[in-house]
């Protein structure tokens, strides 16, 4: 039995609509090359909350909280061809989306 090659693409952004839009765009590009694709798989959203004092030195009880969420999507490509990899390398993603590729 032959070993299947696979590529995992993990997209991360603070804007969920941007992640979804680019995940669908990557899927469209990969479908043109006849590779098998799974996804986009939504991964858990992480919320980050930062608490700071409102004043520089008094009123410890007066605080302000800032929060933001990071959204992630996972795309798996099974048996990618060289054409698939070339087309993925030509994609220009916006600066708001972080891409992590593992094989």
Curated annotation (Swiss-Prot):
- Gene3D superfamilies attached to this UniProt entry: Ribosomal protein S10 domain (3.30.70.600)
Q: Which UniProt keywords apply?
A: Ribonucleoprotein, Ribosomal protein
- The record's disulfide annotation reads none
> TM segments?
none
Q: Which GO terms describe its cellular component?
A: ribonucleoprotein complex; ribosome
- Asked if Iron-sulfur is a keyword of the record, the answer is no
Give the InterPro entries listed for this entry. Ribosomal_uS10, Ribosomal_uS10_CS, Ribosomal_uS10_dom, Ribosomal_uS10_dom_sf
One GO biological process this protein is involved in is: translation
Superkingdom of the source species: Bacteria
One annotated GO molecular function is: tRNA binding
Is Repressor found in the keyword set?
no
| Alphabetized SMART domains for the sequence | Ribosomal_S10 (SM01403)
Q: In UniProt terms, what function does this protein have?
A: Involved in the binding of tRNA to the ribosomes.
Which PANTHER family did the record assign? 30S RIBOSOMAL PROTEIN S10 FAMILY MEMBER
Oligomeric form and interacting partners: Part of the 30S ribosomal subunit.
State the family it belongs to. Answer: Belongs to the universal ribosomal protein uS10 family.
What's this protein's name? Small ribosomal subunit protein uS10
Which organism is this entry from? Pelodictyon phaeoclathratiforme (strain DSM 5477 / BU-1)
Which gene produces this protein?
Answer: rpsJ
């Amino acid at each position: 039995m032959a070993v299947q090659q696979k590529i995992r693409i993990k997209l991360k952004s603070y804007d969920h609509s941007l992640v979804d839009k680019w995940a669908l765009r990557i899927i469209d590009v990969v479908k043109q090359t006849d590779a098998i694709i799974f996804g986009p798989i939504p991964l858990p959203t992480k919320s980050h909350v930062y608490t700071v004092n409102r004043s520089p030195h008094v009123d410890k009880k007066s605080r302000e909280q800032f929060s933001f969420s990071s959204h992630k999507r996972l795309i798996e490509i099974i048996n990618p061809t060289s054409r698939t990899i070339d087309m993925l390398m030509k994609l220009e993603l916006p600066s708001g989306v972080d891409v992590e590729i593992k094989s």
